[in-house]
């Protein structure tokens, strides 16, 4: 029997909430206390890590692990590594030399509170902690997965093209390149890490990676649309900032209506491919649907 939209929403929200609680508890254990020296650096690290957020990437890691019948709590090492990596990217993305944003998750960005130097080091620290946690899994392939997602063929490569495209008229191919690398690569890694740590077969790992890349791109398309349609209060960051900065976004290239259609199509195709895999795909499909219906 199919669930109603309201039932689905509650199911997804409850799963994400429970995942967030698990990840937050683990992050508090893995990160140094604010009182530990150097205190200013650790305050900056925890300031951004515990500023809120959906914890979508670690939730996808947990969901992928469970879908592949993984057992045990070691998956929390990877889940926390993903959230640390994501937070590192946000801290650096907000810097004056990058996107120059003043607000993130409803409060001043890291560099506005601690200064640029400490913010850079806080981001660096989170990235180092992420790889330290992955090393504790004893699975070198997991370290390689995250490294590929972040490197010049991943997030960093996408960020470079994003910066170089500001204020320029670019086509859909360029926008796809930016966001397949800058955003989707890390979401893809979230799914792959869960499958790897569950001991999944290569077919499932590759399929979950492809699913992650497609829903990751859909996530970014929705983000671009929300930047134009939502308020600063709802987003927790400056609404309309992408348009103001001349960023390469989907609405700027194909319009809002076509952007929404693209996001839905990506998710629908991702779900169809997911159902071909020998895994329990239920919660992953619901999270994919949530990506296109979220309002912040």
Q: Model-found features: residue ranges?
A:
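Mg2+-dependent prenyl diphosphate-binding active-site environment of isoprenoid biosynthetic enzymes
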Residues: 21, 31-274, 279-295
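N-terminal amphipathic/basic leader segments beginning at the initiator methionine
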Residues: 1-31
